[in-house]
Design a protein with these regions (language model features):
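Conserved Class I S-adenosyl-L-methionine
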Residues: 73-158
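Residues that cap or flank secondary-structure elements
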Residues: 5, 51-53, 81
Length: 158
């Protein structure tokens, strides 16, 4: 892939930042996509489409270094949940407004959405929707949902 648009954007960050200036990038890593969102298990095709557009963290580090950034490090706030308390509402899956809180749903086909809604309604009817959410949310505690990458533009030497 080569990530040409990412490289172009990072070059622009380097161009406009003063020497010694800081850059903070928040992103969701491919692993976080797979492990950090309980409902992504229901929409694997959409998740794969989204992952195609997400740069892995090692490649991001390499691009930052290539563009003159240094002191590259990252933080993963494991306690941060992007949708807040509503993320833990398993019935939100059935609510279009809840789904509008995550852009991944725009990648879900109408047919797949219909299947997901039927599955959600069946789990709800059997009283298993909450346990489904809890079971598939366990891995989030280890991966988090978002990564903050910090880098500093190198200071020009005379």
């Amino acid at each position: 892939v080569g990530w040409p648009t990412h490289l172009e954007a990072i070059h622009e960050f380097a161009r406009v930042l003063k020497p010694g200036g800081s850059l903070i990038i928040n992103s969701c890593s491919p692993v976080q996509m797979e492990m950090g969102f309980w409902f992504y298990k229901l929409i694997p095709d959409a998740m794969e489409l989204a992952k195609e557009k997400i740069i892995d963290l090692e490649t991001l580090d390499n691009l930052l270094a290539k563009c003159g950034f240094m002191e590259i490090h990252r933080e993963i706030p494991l306690e941060l949940v992007l949708q807040g308390d509503s993320y833990f509402d398993p019935e939100g899956l059935l609510d279009p407004e809840w789904r509008a809180g995550d852009s991944i749903w725009s990648l879900v086909t109408k047919d797949n959405l219909a299947e997901v809604l039927v599955m959600g309604e069946e789990l709800q009817a059997k009283g298993e929707l909450f346990s489904f959410m809890r079971r598939h949310d366990r891995s989030r505690a280890k991966t988090g949902q978002i990564t903050f990458t910090y880098a500093r533009k190198a200071v020009e030497r005379l």
